[in-house]
Amino acid sequence: INCRYNYFSTLNLTGLTELFEIDCSNNMVLNELYVPDSNKLKTIYFENTGLTSIDLTHSPILNWVYGGFNASLQSVFLKGSPFVIYHLNQSPNLQYFCVDESKVVTAQNYVTQLGYNCVVNSYCSFQSGSEIYNIEGNSVFDSTNTSCNTGGTGVPNMKVQISSGTQSAVLTANNLGEYAISVGQGMQTLTPLLENPSYFNVSPTTQTVSFPATTSPFTQNFCVTPNGVHQDLEVAIIPTTPARPGFDAFYKLLIKNKGNIQQSGSVTFTYNDAVLDYLSANPLATTQATGTMTW
């Protein structure tokens, strides 16, 4: 459907589920656009409009989103479209961009390059024009049950679920165990998630915070302590490029302590020296022989 250069203030297309392309660009009075729940919609243009917010979360096969030159645009909801390419240039008032968890880093880099002061996450709780509140904290592992408040070791990449009503998302902490998210007003519930929950105790097990009643930023830390003694070491090899005859192949060797006590030892990587030639390793192996490397 092509409705460029029109004077609609509201455009409701919710019943047109067979649409594969929408173009409503250059419509400066358009401030409400209702997009259909469609498994066929692939492309949408809404450049140079008066829109403040657009929800595209019900169009799972979207490939192209053109939303540039929108001075009033504050929020874009694009979660649920894993293969989409978007253009949001010249929309400097964009405050919130909701995408799939796997796309958060890419989307954040994109809006940063554009110079926007924009929150990007997979938690679609923010409403256009509403106040933004911040939640932050860290997760600390205390092996002796004594040092959570005085130090301890950050739990890298620990996951924290956040939910509000029907909306939920999972945050992943950084290498130091630190996490942060921006949310809209209302009740928010934080729940730490562990890969092996029977190995650990976490305090608190859940935390609820309500905005604007609570001052922003709100800090919530989690203390993780061992529950019994569990040895659980995982070793995996991950190819990062396809193995092709005559070409270099790259692999990552991942050693992960999934238990709750410190472990030590060595790991040996064995390969078929008849068909593979060793080139390099980082870090260098402690010992090396034909077809084997040990760290």
Enumerate the predicted regions with their spans:
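A short, amphipathic beta-strand motif
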Residues: 135-142, 177, 222
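Leucine-rich solenoid repeat scaffolds
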Residues: 71-129
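Short beta-strand elements of extracellular/lumenal beta-sandwich folds
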Residues: 236-265
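A short, solvent-exposed beta-strand micro-motif common in secreted/extracellular proteins
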Residues: 65-68, 86-88, 177, 185-199
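Short, acidic Ser/Thr/Gly-rich low-complexity loop/linker segments typical of extracellular
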Residues: 145-154, 162-178, 182
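Structured interaction patches on ligand/partner-binding surfaces of diverse proteins
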Residues: 82, 106-111, 183-187, 194-221, ...
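Conserved hydrophobic position(s) of the canonical leucine-rich repeat
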Residues: 8, 19-20, 30, 41, ...
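A surface/secretory-pathway sequence property marking extracellular, secreted
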Residues: 201-207, 264-295
